[in-house]
Amino acid sequence: MALSVEEKAQIVTDYQQAVGDTGSPEVQVALLTANINKLQGHFKANGKDHHSRRGLIRMVNQRRKLLDYLKGKDVSRYSALIGRLGLRR
C-alpha cells in the first residue's frame, strides 16, 4: 500500500530544490499527497478500515501544517506547489 522506492525517488527528483534535497517542504508535501491519494483507493474498497483512516487523517494534518509553514515563509513557492499538485487550497 505504501509508495515504492521508485515512486518516492521520482517524486523527490520532481520536487527537490537542489540535488539531494529530501527535506524541503515541497518534497514532503508531494510525498504526503501521493500517499494520501494512494490511500483514497484503499478506502473505496475497504470502507470499514478505521485504523488506516486514522493514519490518513494524520497525514492530511501533517500536510496542512507543512503547507501553512510554507505559506508563511514564501507565498510564491506555496502557490506554485499547490498549482502543481492540484490541491484546492
From Swiss-Prot:
Cite the Pfam families for this sequence.
Ribosomal_S15
Q: Which UniProt keywords apply?
A: Ribonucleoprotein, Ribosomal protein, RNA-binding, rRNA-binding
Q: Which InterPro entries match?
A: Ribosomal_uS15, Ribosomal_uS15_bac-type, uS15_NS1_RNA-bd_sf
Q: Which cysteines are joined by disulfide bonds?
A: none
Which Gene Ontology terms of cellular component type are present? cytosolic small ribosomal subunit
Could you cite one Gene Ontology molecular function of this protein? Answer: structural constituent of ribosome
Which Gene3D superfamilies does the annotation name?
6.10.250.3130, S15/NS1, RNA-binding
Q: Which processes are annotated in GO (biological process)?
A: translation
Its function, per the record, reads: One of the primary rRNA binding proteins, it binds directly to 16S rRNA where it helps nucleate assembly of the platform of the 30S subunit by binding and bridging several RNA helices of the 16S rRNA.
Q: Which HAMAP family match?
A: Ribosomal_uS15_B
Q: Which family does it belong to?
A: Belongs to the universal ribosomal protein uS15 family.
UniProt subunit comment: Part of the 30S ribosomal subunit. Forms a bridge to the 50S subunit in the 70S ribosome, contacting the 23S rRNA.
Q: Which NCBIfam families match?
A: S15_bact
Protein name listed in UniProt = Small ribosomal subunit protein uS15
Which organism encodes this protein?
Pseudomonas syringae pv. tomato (strain ATCC BAA-871 / DC3000)
